Amino acid sequence: MLLSKKSASFALSAFAMLFTSVALAKEAPQAHKAVELSILHINDHHSYLEPHETRINLNGQQTKVDIGGFSAVNAKLNKLRKKYKNPLVLHAGDAITGTLYFTLFGGSADAAVMNAGNFHYFTLGNHEFDAGNEGLLKLLEPLKIPVLSANVIPDKNSILYNKWKPYDIFTVDGEKIAIIGLDTVNKTVNSSSPGKDVKFYDEIATAQIMANALKQQGINKIILLSHAGSEKNIEIAQKVNDIDVIVTGDSHYLYGNDELRSLKLPVIYEYPLEFKNPNGDPVFVMEGWAYSAVVGDLGVKFSPEGIASITRKIPHVLMSSHKLQVKNAEGKWTELTGDERKKALDTLKSMKSISLDDHDAKTDMLISKYKSEKDRLAQEIVGVITGSAMPGGSANRIPNKAGSNPEGSIATRFIAETMYNELKTVDLTIQNAGGVRADILPGNVTFNDAYTFLPFGNTLYTYKMEGSLVKQVLEDAMQFALVDGSTGAFPYGAGIRYEANETPNAEGKRLVSVEVLNKQTQQWEPIDDNKRYLVGTNAYVAGGKDGYKTFGKLFNDPKYEGVDTYLPDAESFIKFMKKHPHFEAYTSSNVKFNASTDALPKK
């Protein structure tokens, strides 16, 4: 429940009074001393317990490698724990949602590997609430790690009451250090499923209230473990006094260095960023990418006055040497061998930020147990589709073309509907046909089928945009599908239907009409060029890929409030089938396309 500004202000005031008068008794001033801390951190592992593939530029060649995996995470944490003084091991939220390990085990697999990693603290992320309060409880009950979140407060009658604390205080070399937890508010309330008995409070106001109260306790060294996202936490760093270090999550940003840039990894910011708070004191902010790919390693020295300085800063990218693939002369991916392989490994071994072949035996055993069960359960039926086949795949991307289904890719409309169901507040969704790789046939649907239909691991993305821009998105996609690029760009949707001509008019436009479904009246209405709609799509086209140029222009413009929900499209498919266990197949794609008699466009 997100409170109105007036209600939130009153509630925060009451919360502040309660916190300062009861939770913390003011202490007399005391002498402080310098202390060093080793902050080791991850965030947003999203049930990625096994390694996954990425591409790097290695010695001038694009190279496929495997990165991440929780065995590597825990092995690296154990090594660094033994190596450095005063380790503090943190997880900045979003442990769950992203793979079948969550879909099938509801957080117990994630809790098991996190327990094996001996984290000191975990903060809640928005995805912790994806399965409601009951779903979060399935993660928290087996979790042996203290959970912190100051701005997420369950009512006393909630099943989540007393399951976490707003902050904790620990002692290092006789010096008290405080750590505060925060969650992202709008994303959790609007894109996840917290119960109405859970209240959410503004991130910045909560951070300042907590910092003030801890300062009154005589503590001058404060860490913020925050899933509020990089942008919000950067704002906190510059607006809130008395916080020294912010370990962030949610944005999935790789904070890196020149080593990682040389590999063409997607470094967003330097590790760590440094800002000044209103008092002029330094505040350090860092994030560790996502999907168990990075262990952040920050050495911090606090002066007696509580001023932080950095003694070490290494974002460790966890990588396997077992896969080093490049394209051969025929364009096929093949393993490097001989001198080329040795040269590649020598380059990686020379980099402080690359950690090769870390494995933890205990974690390997845990994952192996869950993997065997996952492979078995993945064949279980989640629902049944009745009626006709819903055509998809490359042969049916464009309606009414020679060789294709007259309706085009009904399967793509179906996927758009599963997104529409998941993103409960959107007005419409748009999906590219190339993202759906197969026909969806009548019969039983298993967990594995979802990942067969949607193999790219896309996440759901939203924009707030005018109707005129929605129409331009459709125009862009059709142009790319029919003329400029690939048929896979052809657009389908849910909550939206349109008619278009293959041959553009004198103004270069193909659209004849566009209608949006009014959720209140359940009536179709002409799209309003000036109205702002909340539009859902997948993160791939949201960034401008596949010819979706207008989406691409909105991507970095805050006016359009772009949000990557990090909800997996395959997970949305599974949830839809669970909600509709006997689903009658669609027979329409919601697209009327007046095709010409020209030859098929190029694939």
Curated annotation (Swiss-Prot):
Annotated Gene Ontology cellular component terms: outer membrane-bounded periplasmic space
First and last residue of the signal peptide: 1-25
EC number: 3.1.3.5
Domain of life: Bacteria
Site (Transition state stabilizer) residue list: H127, D130
Keywords noted in UniProt: Hydrolase, Metal-binding, Nucleotide-binding, Periplasm, Signal, Zinc
Binding site for Zn(2+) 1: D44, H46, D94
UniProt cofactor note: Binds 2 Zn(2+) ions per subunit.
Matches recorded under Gene3D superfamilies: 3.60.21.10, 5'-Nucleotidase, C-terminal domain
Catalytic activity annotation: a ribonucleoside 5'-phosphate + H2O = a ribonucleoside + phosphate
Names of required cofactors: Zn(2+)
Any GO BP: nucleotide catabolic process
Compartment annotation: Periplasm
Binding site for substrate: R397, R437, F456, Y540, V541, A542, G543, G544, K545, D546
Keyword Plastid: no
One GO MF term: metal ion binding
One Pfam entry name: 5_nucleotid_C
Binding site for Zn(2+) 2: D94, N126, H227
Family affiliation: Belongs to the 5'-nucleotidase family.
Role description: Degrades NAD into adenosine and nicotinamide riboside, the latter being subsequently internalized by a specific permease. Also endowed with NAD(P) pyrophosphatase activity. Exhibits a broad substrate specificity, recognizing either mono- or dinucleotide nicotinamides and different adenosine phosphates with a maximal activity on 5'-adenosine monophosphate.
This protein's name: NAD 5'-nucleotidase
